[in-house]
Amino acid sequence: MKKIFSISMLFLVTFSFGQKLFIVKSDEKFGLINESGIEVIPPKYNFIEDFDKVHPNWAKVQLENLFGFVDKTGKIVVEAKYESIGNYNEYNQGWALIKKDGKLGFINESGKEVVPPVYDKVGNFGEYAKDWASVESQGMKGFITTDGNIIVPLKYSSIEKFDGIRKNWALVKDKKDKLGFIDKSGKEIIPVMYDSIEAFTKKKTSAVSTEKKTEVATAD
């Protein structure tokens, strides 16, 4: 067994069969030993958080300013490669927000990346539509779903809330400042080609205009 110098210990957790784990510190690094003094995790981490605080049976660890997770056997379940890892279930059930190279994504409860960290901003699920979250990259916006798929491509410079002008529709604008609508299936129901769009009336029509002409769009 490796000898550990300058050890400080803090009771962490008890297994179902009664085994206790302790945080140990050596040369400003943290690890875990069991009650027999055997290393479960060698002291190599800058920080070890309490087990079960973020994820059942896991502890968040920090290694050279990057974060990951280990389990109670000392196994690395999520490599310490993220700049930050948020709390589970904060955005979506069973997901935790991650940040890598300045970009955002999500991991699930098994530690798998269900949404790769490629986004500059991520919104809350349900803010625009049920099971959708807004995402943004390089100033362009779209939506992902709770299964991790992109339902609206990131091609709009702005997306208004649904139902603001017409029920179940959201006004969108592209990088050329052209306007159109998407519906709650993610379909572009009115092409993004207009310079202005006025509100729908009780007759379910709206005036839309380009630089050359004005037309009337009809809501089904």
Please state what every model-predicted region is.
Residues 19-220:
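Residue-level detector of conserved, function-critical positions
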